[in-house]
Amino acid sequence: MDKESITNAEENSYDKPNNNIRPQGFDDFLGQNNIKSKLKVFINSAKKREVSLDHILFYGPPGLGKTTLAQIIANEMGSNIKATSAPIIERPGDLASILTTLGEKDILFIDEIHRLRTVVEEVLYSAMEDFFVDIKVGEGTSAKSFRVKLPHFTLIGATTRSGLLSTPLYDRFGIVERLEFYTNEDLANIVKRSSEFLNINITDEAAISIASRSRGTPRIVNRLLRRVFDFATVHDVLKIDEKFACDSLEKLGIDKNGFEALDKLYLNTIIKHYNGGPVGVDTLSVSLSEQIETIEDVIEPYLIQCGFIKRTPKGRVATNKAYGYLNLSSKYDDNYSNEERGLFDF
């Protein structure tokens, strides 16, 4: 999948940094109400006892607010935050140098934490549990190791693939929360909030239309809002209504479900090339010329959430909803025509 795809929930060049849009506190963070209510309790408890917050793991599809929540937690705790990404931390010494710069109750945020190398991850064990690191100096027989005490800090890890975390690392997180896709109502409220900061005049109906095509993801809803605003600016439209929003999104190649060409190709491949499934992700990766990680983390989560495909032990299976979306009769239906059956003859 093109990383610059407008409905790719991973961060890309469409996402212009805007500190005004990014929520700074829980009151500004719309959605994920269950998680927010629990985090408020944990934070208030830690502040009342004057201790650092337990280590936190956020997991779920990209673009749902894991990084933003980490920043909000730092703000609520009155703590400094150091943000990094697992692929950047190549050696144990890289991690040790980061840890030794932290202050008491500071927060270390590691994105894509499932991608930590094992030798780096092992440094975290003692750091998270006992707040020390052993630093090795020198090489060979002359090498020496000395122990450095660390302040009581909070590690916040974020991942789209919690299943890839090792058990020793996973078990050291005291708080583990899964972020879910957002409702259209929450996304429409995000559109209206962002519109105020960006000075965009938009109707409630247009906000709902943009929200419904945003794949349950705040990052995408803000991205689509900006692109619709681009069309409005070029065409001298002073107020974005529902029709203008829908027309603009259609021009961007995004249908009412929030699907792009690759989503349709994915469904067509399963149904027309593999008889609706089951088909393995390795095979799909070859057929689509996409990495397995992209299929599993970017394409499939929303299709599964919407009920278009199922993951089974034998592979991916298209549902009746997928057949209907492509205007095909399901192979399990009595109305399945001979012509359509021919699509699956090899």
Swiss-Prot record:
One of its GO terms (biological process) is DNA recombination. Residues 1-22 have a biased composition (Polar residues). It holds the Pfam family RuvB_N. Residues 183-253 are annotated as: Small ATPAse domain (RuvB-S). Keywords: ATP-binding, Cytoplasm, DNA damage, DNA recombination, DNA repair, DNA-binding, Hydrolase, Nucleotide-binding. One of its GO terms (cellular component) is Holliday junction resolvase complex. Its EC number is 3.6.4.-. One of its GO terms (molecular function) is ATP hydrolysis activity. CDD domains: AAA (cd00009). Residues 1-182 are annotated as: Large ATPase domain (RuvB-L). Mg(2+) binds at residue 67. The RuvA-RuvB-RuvC complex processes Holliday junction (HJ) DNA during genetic recombination and DNA repair, while the RuvA-RuvB complex plays an important role in the rescue of blocked DNA replication forks via replication fork reversal (RFR). RuvA specifically binds to HJ cruciform DNA, conferring on it an open structure. The RuvB hexamer acts as an ATP-dependent pump, pulling dsDNA into and through the RuvAB complex. RuvB forms 2 homohexamers on either side of HJ DNA bound by 1 or 2 RuvA tetramers; 4 subunits per hexamer contact DNA at a time. NCBIfam families: PRK00080.1, ruvB. This is Holliday junction branch migration complex subunit RuvB. The gene is ruvB.
